[in-house]
């Protein structure tokens, strides 16, 4: 078969990681924020990375390079900037890069500091975005030129470009009203006028196709929102072709509306929802292209290209050149380059594929076009992932036997909360409004250097452990000086709250350069679950008991919960998520038992990821919540009644799942609430949460120091919903990313505010 441009299968990705394989963007951003480099130097790093990443795509043979997927903080904030949609407190007339940073962080090298905008999770991922703020009188004005500059930049380099835009309906959905009494959907006509201008500018730049992302189509949308797409895409129709992109789940429940839209192509995620393919193909209008998202942008596993070929060959036969092949979603969620991972075992390495390698998996398009050599290469490429199913490394009979023996009783504490709290109050003897922190303290340059030197072999294990004990002792003394009530050991030994446990539990592979952006300059390095999971020995007991030996105050044991470990790693794909979570839960249960036996009276099991793990469709939530809650309870249920179990949730908009949060049966839950001005506590207006709660009283993601008055205001607001005897006082989240000066100043305000509140309460009691 002769391949021509007429019948060639077009290849593209929905986006590429932006931080750089060595986190170049992160380090440049942080230098700029500290005033160590000028803005033009930061922009040079961005340009260098964009050209490198376009080169990766072209080098892999992709037909289009994605432009507009680069962002200085996140792509939703980029969209706000593009639309001139700036919160009034940050609006200085003409938006620039420092405007963007002030919206995201509350401060920038120029301009006045003020409250950062809210930040939340991007659908069910561990990526975050800055939430757009909508008011009734909002206007949209295309004023920030970054997208158009990048298109010109890529075209000048000789690339065939496909700009990436967040669609108007999704943009509105992802924001929130800052005023009561109006619906942000009413802003759609005004917003569409701005989008028309954007598309006209792209057309003038010679753009043929625009990728317009509408991921909310995977949700079960309210009727007015679902119907709004018809208006949106009537208005946006023009000479530039629109590829409507959906991802993360099935969209067939909206298919009848989608096929009526005035667009030129549809992208569907066949990694997350392969079952939708036939329905989409059957309904596809005859003049549309179908972009099949078959290269998984959310995992690190090598694609089974032989299977992909089998699935797509009938579609190719039916659609011909109207079939495109793409990534399931943006490759933003994948690490960048597997070639850097020289420390992984050869057996594990051959199962994996990172963003750069995933671009090469579009070899399958050549196979679809009938290239015999490509068909053979697809079979060769797929062989390791097929052989993995029978690898002795993957399956552990003892772990399977233990998980198969799980019963309902294994997930229950030996006493109900009412009895536990009575015993705990007697055993712990804490004051009204106990003060504590969430777990981590600043990871200083000294700590990071010592960890790096230890891993490189420049520091012996004995010397490293001595250094860590010094950092723990320092953290304990600082807490003594601050007069906190419940201490933490500070987690100096942990580089990451999940990776630390992944290194100590059997069943994980840990990478060196597998960084993935979480938000802004914050990157995480998810471990990979390659086999059955179990605990070979205690993981945290030594450090926790050492910290406890240094003080008469209570020191919390600190664990990361099973759902979060699962959610913040790359899971294996041959076991259901519930089964993996139960394996982790049993390992943590053993750790809880050992901490308790060592005299630790408060144990925190963090579950910040429980909300983000929810399926996108609300009708599927309860099934997920049932097994997620059960996994947490399995991990905690070995605790005796007098042992107090804490859990922590951050960025968790859990108002809709409050009953499941209560079902965790944690004695104390701490949550992020300050950035939303305690808005998350609205859940407690209608639901009487039975246990103790610590609503975060200041935002640790901002370097701004809270005042005593601000904290008092937030606690008084919380007190209207939670009885004061069940309130704890704590920051929103861990303090790992802050420096000690900021940390101590903020905690000093928190403790002083608490003492002031106690005095007020005592005066009331008299």
UniProtKB/Swiss-Prot annotation:
It comes from Photobacterium profundum (strain SS9). Keywords: Amino-acid biosynthesis, Metal-binding, Methionine biosynthesis, Methyltransferase, Repeat, Transferase, Zinc. Zn(2+) binds at residues 648, 650, 672, 733. Its EC number is 2.1.1.14. The active site is at residue 701. The gene is metE. Belongs to the vitamin-B12 independent methionine synthase family. It catalyses: 5-methyltetrahydropteroyltri-L-glutamate + L-homocysteine = tetrahydropteroyltri-L-glutamate + L-methionine. L-methionine binds at residues 438-440, 491, 606. The keyword Amino-acid biosynthesis applies. GO terms for molecular function: 5-methyltetrahydropteroyltriglutamate-homocysteine S-methyltransferase activity; zinc ion binding. Pfam families: Meth_synt_1, Meth_synt_2. PANTHER family: 5-METHYLTETRAHYDROPTEROYLTRIGLUTAMATE--HOMOCYSTEINE METHYLTRANSFERASE. L-homocysteine binds at residues 438-440, 491, 606. SUPFAM superfamilies: UROD/MetE-like (SSF51726). Transmembrane segments: none annotated. GO terms for biological process: methionine biosynthetic process; methylation. Pathway: Amino-acid biosynthesis; L-methionine biosynthesis via de novo pathway; L-methionine from L-homocysteine (MetE route): step 1/1. This is 5-methyltetrahydropteroyltriglutamate--homocysteine methyltransferase.
